[in-house]
Amino acid sequence: MDNDYGLIKESVIKADSALQTAVNEKDGIRILNQDFFETLISFIISQNKNIPQIKQCVKNISHRFGDEVIGYNCEAFYVFPDVDRLHEVTEDELRECKVGFRAPYIMNATEAVYSGNVTKEKLDALDIEQARELLMTIKGVGEKVANCVLLFGLGRREAFPVDVWMKRIMESMYFDGKDTKKLEIEAFAVKKFGNLGGYAQQYLFDYARTTLFK
C-alpha cells in the first residue's frame, strides 16, 4: 500500500471520515523516502527557521562541503555531504553556513552517526518508541524533530509530528478547540490513525496551512 496513493487516501478517510475534506482538497501529497542523515541534519536546522531559510542553509552546506554533480541539461549542483565528510567540518565552518545556534547540534548529530551510536540500521531494528528515544539522545533533537526524522528519513509511516499548525488543527477538529498538550495529541493520533499517521498528518498539515487557517 506504501506506493498506492489511491488506496492510501481511501484508507485515511476510512480511518476517520472527518479527514475527507482535507484529503480531497489536497490531492497529490506524497511522502518521499529521503536520505536518513540529510533528513536528520535538515530537521535540526529547521528549528526556528522558515522554509526558505532552511533550504538556504542546506544549500550552503551542500555547496561548501558536498560533491559537485552534473545533472539534467548539464547543470551543475552540489549534493549534501555524507557523514564522513561532514565529520571533518569544524563548528566555525558550519556557522559560516548560517546555521547559527544549531551548529553544535549538527556537530553532535554527525558524531552520533559517525561513531555508530545512532545509525539507520540501529533505528530500523527498534520499535518506534525506542527509535524516537534513541534519536532524542542527540542534542537539539526533541520529540517533533525525532518524529519528522522517523517519518521522512526512516519511512516510519506511523510517526505523527506535531508542530504549531498540527496542534491548532488537531485541537480544532478533535479537542473542541481546547488547549491540549502535544503528547496527548500524539497519543490520540497513534490510536486514531495507526500506521496511517504520517499520511494523515501530511494531509492535515497542508490543509490547515493553506486552507483552514489561511
What are these regions (language model features)?
Residues M1-K214:
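HhH-family (HhH-GPD) DNA N-glycosylase catalytic core used in base-excision repair
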